[in-house]
């Protein structure tokens, strides 16, 4: 079983574009062949917000999505261990990077009326958070095994102290930060959400997605949980896996969804 998408050969690179001045404030843009304007998938990688994981994790996913006719805008961001990473820099970068599409849309022939955001693991947390920020209009969110409840993740000690490392402390000490950063506390998001989670995920418990979607539905959001039978954590970002068709179809459903 894959332990990381870094275990497979690299995909062809996208076009690297800076959305701010810092070393890690960049994104990789891939645009499909043919005339635009092209719909867009904002893609945010996971890795528990830590610096040792980067956007290489989702290169193959981006290539596969681009083959379906969508441009992909894969964001790097300051992470725990980078200068300025954690609270609030990590979140600020995601918001700024997403908003940067407005500046490059005309030149790159991007259709900003058809934008979805997809993220994996910690990136799933970040895309759900992004939906509440009004950085850019979104048709929908595809959250793949998201860390959607930061208080619960802290209670479970997922990846050790990483949630406290991200936000700077515990929920008891920094309740307002958890309230501002945790998707389950931000619902309703007002954007369609499709949450995919493997039933064999041993990195982010399925329980977290179940709790999140229940809360989102209760708030009135169009939120749906898709439990992918037999899939672990990384199969959801592997275009060669048996889980990929449902990921692909979910992205296409949302990008073509009537506003």
Regions found by a protein language model. Give the residues of each.
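N-terminal cap/lid segment of alpha/beta-hydrolase-fold proteins
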Residues: 1-35
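Alpha/beta-hydrolase active-site loop
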Residues: 85-106
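Short amphipathic alpha-helix adjacent to the substrate-entry channel of hydrolases
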Residues: 55-73
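Glycine-rich nucleophile elbow surrounding the catalytic serine of serine-hydrolase chemistry
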Residues: 119-129
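Gly/Ser-rich "nucleophile elbow"/oxyanion-hole loop immediately N-terminal to the catalytic nucleophile
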Residues: 100-116, 121
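Short beta-strand/loop motif that positions the catalytic acidic residue
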Residues: 189, 195-197, 201
């Amino acid at each position: 079983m894959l332990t990381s998408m870094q275990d497979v050969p690299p995909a062809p690179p996208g076009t690297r574009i800076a959305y701010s001045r810092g070393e890690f404030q960049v994104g990789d843009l891939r645009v499909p062949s043919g005339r635009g304007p092209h719909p867009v998938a904002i893609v945010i990688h996971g890795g528990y917000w830590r610096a040792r994981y980067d956007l290489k994790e989702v290169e193959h996913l981006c290539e596969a999505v681009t083959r379906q006719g969508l441009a992909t805008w894969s964001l790097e961001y300051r992470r725990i261990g980078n200068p300025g990473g954690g609270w609030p820099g990590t979140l600020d970068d995601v918001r700024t990077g997403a908003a940067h599409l407005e500046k490059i849309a005309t030149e790159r022939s991007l259709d900003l009326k058809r934008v979805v955001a997809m993220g994996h693991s910690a990136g799933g947390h970040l895309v759900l958070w992004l939906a509440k920020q009004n950085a850019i209009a979104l048709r929908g969110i595809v959250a793949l095994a998201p860390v959607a409840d930061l208080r619960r993740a802290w209670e479970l000690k997922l990846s050790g102290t990483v949630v406290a490392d991200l936000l700077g402390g515990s929920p008891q000490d920094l309740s307002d930060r958890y309230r501002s950063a945790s998707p389950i506390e931000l619902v309703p998001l007002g954007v369609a959400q499709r949450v995919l989670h493997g039933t064999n995920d041993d990195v982010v418990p399925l329980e977290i997605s179940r709790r999140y979607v229940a809360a989102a539905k209760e708030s009135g959001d169009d939120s749906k949980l898709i439990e992918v039978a037999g899939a672990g954590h990384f199969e959801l970002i592997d275009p060669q896996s048996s889980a990929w068709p449902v990921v692909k179809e979910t992205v296409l459903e949302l990008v073509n969804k009537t506003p």
